Amino acid sequence: FGRGRVVSYSPSGAVEVRAAGRAFLDMRARIERQIEQRTLMLSGVSHDMRTPLTRLRLGLSMLDHEDRSELERDVADLQRLLDDFLDFARGEAASGQPEQTDPHALAAKAVAEAQRDGCSLMLAPPSGTGLVALRPLSIHRALTNLIGNALRYGTHCEVSVVISKRALCLRVEDDGPGIPEDQREQALKPFVRLDPARNQDRGSGVGLGLAIAADIARSHGGTLRLGHSDRLGGLCADIVIAR
């Protein structure tokens, strides 16, 4: 359950063991119910907020181009912020069960999408082979967040995948200012933006990109580690998941 896997379980054995098992099942049910209710509520909020945003876009389309360009960027920023809030609140509730997945293919897809947008990044040669139990959509989201974060604060980034017998490591490195060691734990918390190296002026957002990636890593029984990139000199972000 801690790794995001719902396994059928029926308490058995001694009285104390059965009591502990039933208490765990009750706890799991309460957690699942809370996640479902939160997701439904925020999905409704998201829908209600998208309607006025659509009206704003329609109204802006009637203005002259030179008058509406900055306003359209503001509306687009609001849309991205809304999507980030919803993704963070949704967590893993709608992402399905883990399936045997090729991590190299996932990384290649995320890199190709960023390259199509004109971003400067590359995928390192693969290290190791094999399938890993992952939620593909969630891991793709985590990689996209890390790549977007890297390119927001740097000019170039590199993505690499290492598969060993015991673990999977998805790494994103950049040539930006990095994050001081004493601030890395803080950087993984939601709604945290660090100053002055990584501040609001560097791009839109509310500090959810790393938090969402860390949440996805934890839901797979893994972790998101932040460090210094010896190769590029900036931040090194590792998603490490046990196999």
List the model feature ranges, each with a label.
Residues 120-130, 134:
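Conserved catalytic submotifs in the C-terminal HATPase_c
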Residues 157, 221-228:
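Glycine-rich ATP-binding loops of the HATPase_c
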Residues 4-7, 11-26:
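HAMP signal relay modules and closely related sensory coiled-coil linkers
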Residues 31-80:
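Membrane-proximal coiled-coil signaling linkers
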Residues 92-97, 131-134:
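Conserved micro-motifs of the catalytic ATP-binding
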Residues 179-192:
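Short conserved segment of the HATPase_c
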